[in-house]
Amino acid sequence: MAHCDFVTNSLIQNATATLHTNRGDIKVALFGNHVPKTVANFVGLAQGTKEYSTQNASGGPSGPFYDGAVFHRVIQGFMIQGGDPTGTGRGGPGYKFADEFHPELQFDKPYLLAMANAGPGTNGSQFFITVGETPHLNRRHTIFGEVTDPDSQKVVDAISTTATDGNDRPTEPVVIDSITIS
């Protein structure tokens, strides 16, 4: 078990996640050196190596958790949110974990990847990517990555301006086909 933890810790220190969506790829630099537990959770769910007790986005009990999930909430000028296997905004992996804040990570620019939650200590699988400065979220949501690639930022911007219904749900599904970690 210690060897597995070492491999995981080595991987998350400088990991990059690529969200392959039906609108294009979004490459995210993960902050494993600042928020290792949050990054390990995301990487484990993305790769299907972390246990969860609900069905994943593909409807199965195991394997990559996010494959087939949608961005279920999009608010222009604010953020795009995904990671819920049910696509409703109420789903998750069947567990919750504590917030992990780092003083160097602040919502002072766009394109930050952070955990969505329903209050302190309620992180699970849902995440969002900001499209503007959102300082009111500081110390409320764990920042664990950043979209730094200009082409990926264009994909985020395009998703953030997609047509939505009255519940901020895209009228045409924005699907996360898969996530690769490198």
Swiss-Prot record:
* Presence of keyword Transmembrane: no
Q: What is its main location?
A: cytoplasm
Task: Please indicate if the UniProt record lists Cytoplasm as a keyword.
Answer: yes
Query: Region (Disordered): which ranges?
Result: 161-182
Q: What EC number is given for this enzyme? A: 5.2.1.8
What InterPro entries would the database entry show? Answer: Cyclophilin-like_dom_sf (IPR029000), Cyclophilin-type_PPIase (IPR024936), Cyclophilin-type_PPIase_CS (IPR020892), Cyclophilin-type_PPIase_dom (IPR002130), Cyclophilin_A-like (IPR044666)
* Keywords from the named record: Cytoplasm, Isomerase, Rotamase
- A GO-annotated cellular component: cytoplasm
Catalytic activity annotation:
[protein]-peptidylproline (omega=180) = [protein]-peptidylproline (omega=0)
Task: Supply the SUPFAM superfamilies for this chain.
Answer: Cyclophilin-like
Q: Which Gene Ontology BP terms does the record give?
A: protein folding
State where the protein is found: Cytoplasm
Pfam families in the record: Pro_isomerase
User: What CDD domains does the database record attribute to this sequence?
Assistant: cyclophilin (cd00317)
> From the UniProt record, which GO molecular function terms apply?
peptidyl-prolyl cis-trans isomerase activity
EC primary class: isomerase
Instruction: Give the PPIase cyclophilin-type domain ranges.
Output: 13-181
Q: What does this protein do?
A: PPIases accelerate the folding of proteins. It catalyzes the cis-trans isomerization of proline imidic peptide bonds in oligopeptides.
Entry similarity comment: Belongs to the cyclophilin-type PPIase family.
Q: What is this protein called?
A: Probable peptidyl-prolyl cis-trans isomerase A
Gene that this sequence comes from = ppiA
